[in-house]
Amino acid sequence: WRECSFDEIKSPLALQEYLQELARMDRANIGRLLQMPPGQNEDVWQYEHLRMLCVDMNYLVIQLEHECNKESCPEMKAAEWLFFCAAHAQPQSCCAIDYAFHTLDGATSLLNSHKYFPSRQSIISSSLKHFQSIARRLYRVFAHAWFHHREEFTSFEASVARCHPWIAHCTDA
C-alpha cells in the first residue's frame, strides 16, 4: 500500500481509516499518531483512538492468556493495587484475565452503542464522560500486564506499540 494523506480519504469514516493508515505505516512515530488532521473534531479523534486501542488490546489479552489465569492471577492487581470489575451488577473481584476480557467487551460495547455514540462524525457532549472511565479501565489492564507479566507486555509492545502512544495521547489530551 502506498501512503496517503488525510485529504485523499473520501469516506464517512476518514478519521478511522487515516489513524489505521498511520499505525500501519509507523506505529513507533508517536507524534504523528497523535497529530490530528487540521479541521477535524477532537472528540471524534479521541473516540477513534479508543476504538483502535480496544482492537489492539485484544492481542495483548490473548497473549496473556497462557500465563495469566485464575490460578496465577486470582485477582485483578497492578503492583499491589486491587481493582474490582465493573462488568457486574455490583462491582466485584474477578481474576485478572476475566477482568481484562470484561473490560474490553464493555469498552467495545459502549463505544459501539448507538445510544451513547449515535454518530461517528460527532460525539454528543453527554457521552464524553465515558472516555475517562474507558481509558482508566484499559490502563489497568496495561498496568497489570506491566507489573505481573512483563515479558508478555514487552513482547506485545515491541510488535504492536500501543501502550506508549496511548499514554502520550491521554496525557496530551
Named regions from a protein language model:
Residues 1-122:
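Extended alpha-helical interaction segments
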